[in-house]
């Protein structure tokens, strides 16, 4: 033991204050999305080359991006961290246990390992951040809330990352349909000076699910400075996704021009650095297509910048489904069929969570989307309605998975499953107040 502890009282196995400070700055970047943490982690390694945690943090950060091209770098960092475990303390070794499971594709097992770590280390924000991220990727709404709830009473405003932990909790509450509590916690997270994009995001989700599209547009405009530049850096790394939410509020108002403006500002093809940004772009363009909005060359630009070789498939069914949407939207029917085959094969050959998801949900969902793209709307409707009750398995949020629901409504309207479409619309109308978009679907399904 070195006697050093981090800002939240967790013992660390480095004797270098510089290494500790750099690692804590990297953790803040992970939770705030202000700048990539890799430079800070490199600084921590330079200050103490024998400390395993910065290498583990780099591995976890890269794995969390679900980016196929970064997997090799992630595994290399994890290998270095494992070689240095002799000097690591019990908490740091527990992170390595979770990361090994994560690297092997066992997302649920990794989440359980982080939960076990948090029992004895309730203020380990790294375990909270990573556990929360993969709860989100697994669509586990209950654990998004419960993981943070189990430790939140051990936190207070005295701890610098407390607002960011509140942001995690707010999102977990929202995904658990506890909308009033979620909004209150999200607003509380933003009551001080901390800029917490995840809390802004949680409140935006509340407003989306409640059909408060005008409130949502005002909210995003009011909090814009909190996901802008900080200390001369580029805009917040979460800006693309928050811009996606801004576009959804515009769509709910049937402001198609506003949605396209948000797309061009926050999700243009030349600004995409990772697959998660391309996923948001594909989801938004698809929703516009469902409404009959002309999007110009945006589909083609999106696909042109998206690495979609066979080696890119199989890491995340959620990402693979959105890549298929992009190919269909761009009119690349041959490539779309090839992508389904590659993603299905990669899923079957893989291990862990993604293999199960691709087999149970991803592959049949992709076949339904291909049918939709081919104009076989009844086949698409039959495929999608059979999957909807288990759609959370795909991962992501309620708002993100609504693209499947809207595709199903469109298939019913365009094909002969009109009675099914009306029943699904009735279900939707009971859950959300009237908005221009909801009324548009009512007219479409009554035609």
Q: Whereabouts are the PLM-identified features?
A:
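Inter-helical turn/loop elements of alpha-helical hairpins
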Residues: 2, 15-20, 25-42, 46-50, ...
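Flexible helix-coil transition and linker loops at the boundaries of alpha-helical arrays
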Residues: 10-12, 80-92, 119-121, 152-162, ...
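Generic helix N-cap/helix-start motif at coil->alpha-helix transitions
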Residues: 17-22, 50-52, 88-94, 121-128, ...
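Tandem amphipathic alpha-helical repeat scaffolds
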Residues: 25-27, 53-67, 95-104, 126-140, ...
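Alpha-helical repeat scaffolds
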Residues: 40-43, 71-85, 108-118, 142-155, ...
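Asp-box/WD-like beta-propeller blade repeats and closely related beta-sheet repeat scaffolds
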Residues: 111, 115, 121-124, 129-134
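Helix-coil-helix junctions within alpha-helical repeat/solenoid scaffolds
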Residues: 248-447
């Amino acid at each position: 033991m070195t006697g050093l502890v981090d800002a939240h009282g967790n013992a660390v196995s480095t004797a270098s204050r510089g290494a500790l400070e750099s690692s804590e700055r990297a953790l803040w970047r992970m939770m705030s999305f202000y700048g990539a943490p890799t430079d800070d982690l490199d600084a921590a390694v330079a200050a103490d080359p024998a400390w395993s945690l910065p290498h583990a943090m780099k591995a976890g950060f890269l794995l969390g991006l679900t980016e196929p091209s970064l997997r090799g770098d992630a595994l290399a960092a994890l290998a270095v961290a494992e070689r240095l475990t002799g000097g690591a303390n019990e908490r740091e070794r527990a992170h390595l246990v979770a990361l090994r499971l994560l690297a092997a594709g066992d997302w649920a097992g990794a989440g359980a390992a982080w939960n076990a770590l948090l029992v004895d280390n309730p203020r380990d924000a790294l375990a909270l951040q990573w556990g929360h991220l993969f709860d989100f990727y697994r669509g586990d709404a209950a654990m998004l809330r419960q993981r943070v709830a189990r430790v939140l009473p051990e936190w207070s405003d005295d701890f610098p990352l407390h607002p960011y932990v509140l942001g995690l909790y707010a999102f977990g509450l929202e995904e658990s349909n506890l909308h009033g509590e979620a909004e209150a916690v999200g607003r509380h997270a933003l009551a001080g000076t901390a800029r917490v994009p995840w809390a802004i995001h949680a409140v935006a989700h509340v407003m989306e699910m409640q059909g408060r599209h005008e409130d949502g547009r005002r909210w995003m405009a009011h909090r814009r400075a909190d996901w802008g530049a900080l200390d001369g850096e580029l805009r917040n790394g979460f800006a693309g996704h928050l811009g996606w939410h801004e576009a959804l509020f515009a769509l709910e108002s049937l402001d198609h021009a506003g949605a396209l403006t948000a797309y061009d500002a926050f999700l243009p093809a030349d600004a995409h650095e990772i697959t998660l940004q391309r996923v948001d772009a594909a989801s938004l363009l698809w929703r516009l297509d469902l409404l009959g909005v002309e999007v110009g060359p945006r589909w083609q630009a999106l696909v042109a910048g998206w690495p979609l070789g066979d080696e890119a498939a199989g890491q995340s069914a959620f990402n693979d489904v959105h890549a298929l949407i992009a190919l269909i939207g761009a009119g690349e029917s041959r490539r779309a069929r090839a992508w389904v085959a590659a993603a299905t094969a990669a899923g079957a050959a893989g291990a862990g969570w993604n293999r199960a998801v691709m087999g149970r949900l991803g592959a049949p969902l992709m076949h339904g989307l291909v049918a939709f793209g081919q104009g076989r709307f009844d086949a698409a409707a039959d495929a999608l309605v059979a999957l909807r009750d288990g759609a959370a398995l795909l991962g992501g949020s309620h708002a993100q998975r609504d693209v499947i629901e809207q595709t199903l409504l469109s298939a019913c309207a365009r094909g002969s499953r009109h009675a099914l479409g009306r029943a699904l619309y009735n279900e939707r109308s009971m859950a959300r107040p009237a908005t221009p978009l909801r009324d548009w679907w009512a007219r479409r399904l009554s035609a």
